[in-house]
């Protein structure tokens, strides 16, 4: 029996283009008998797909094997690619097909595009995405923020209006329970705060720590926002559900901002309110060494004689925590409050 005669390879046809997406291209080839795997592997034809480098005008192998289909992945959207097929015979001879050119498709609109448009304050792109109807307006980003939350936090008032007009829910919350109004109050964006209030945002909403928008506005320290919130009817002495702190208590604990504290007190905040542990704003200000705030609270009627749950007063606390400047202040105030002894002649 004569040995099988291997014919030299003829020039193959270019690979056929199958399914094309924004990041992949399917290529396949049908070479009749050459694709059949008969006999030992050394008698099979081997196929390679090569991709052209448009800058260097060279080719790189992206697939080699015995299959008749390959999906090229990890491609860029709307980009032209050129491929050729290399067929290698069992004897090692090879032939190349003509080139085939194919472009990937446009990347489909997704939630990432929505959040990207908001992040860079691109009004036109945001409108186009929303008008396309393929992306839900309230889909959160990877941090759990809706597009409205991001726009409110950044102070992009025009984007806020676009999102609200397209049906976004102004009362949605992120993973920590904060809504768009809280974020805008903390960041000090008064125009956004006013707009959200007109469209249903509530002062009563609470985050997971039980804090309201006024607690966050106090932390942010933006007096114009706080002043407007008070005029709009926001409760001044609202208590969080965690520590039992009012906004004034948070000022004493966090920033020590005298202007914010003064605004709250003038609007009716109780300077002698107690938290769950019996501490007053004055005690908390002393512990955090906010000397000027301590002075303000005393001037506004804070009672320095109040004791906490352990029977300790503010002067004892200041000494224990070595708040020397506060100790001096409290001692000076105490001296001034002592009644003068009458002179006996």
Curated annotation (Swiss-Prot):
Residue ranges annotated for the Fibronectin type-III domain, each copy included: 8-108
Quaternary structure (record): Interacts with COPS5; regulates the phosphorylation of JUN and the transcriptional activity of AP-1. Interacts with RYBP; may prevent the ubiquitin-mediated proteasomal degradation of FANK1.
Modified how: Polyubiquitinated. Polyubiquitination leads to proteasomal degradation.
Tissue and organ expression note: Mostly restricted to testis.
Comment, domains: The fibronectin type-III domain mediates interaction with COPS5 and RYBP.
ANK repeats: 109-139, 143-172, 176-205, 209-238, 243-273, 277-306
Stated name of the protein: Fibronectin type 3 and ankyrin repeat domains protein 1
Gene Ontology terms describing biological process: negative regulation of apoptotic process; positive regulation of apoptotic process; positive regulation of DNA-binding transcription factor activity; positive regulation of DNA-templated transcription
GO cellular component, one term: chromatin
Functional note: Through the activation of JUN and AP-1-mediated transcription, may regulate apoptosis.
Subcellular localization, as worded in the UniProt entry: Nucleus; Cytoplasm, Cytosol; Cytoplasm, Cytoskeleton, Cilium basal body; Cell projection, Cilium
PANTHER family noted in UniProt: FIBRONECTIN TYPE 3 AND ANKYRIN REPEAT DOMAINS PROTEIN 1 (PTHR24183:SF1)
Keywords: ANK repeat, Cell projection, Cytoplasm, Cytoskeleton, Nucleus, Repeat, Ubl conjugation
Chief location category: nucleus
SUPFAM superfamilies: Ankyrin repeat, Fibronectin type III
Pfam families assigned to the protein according to its UniProt record, in alphabetical order: Ank_2
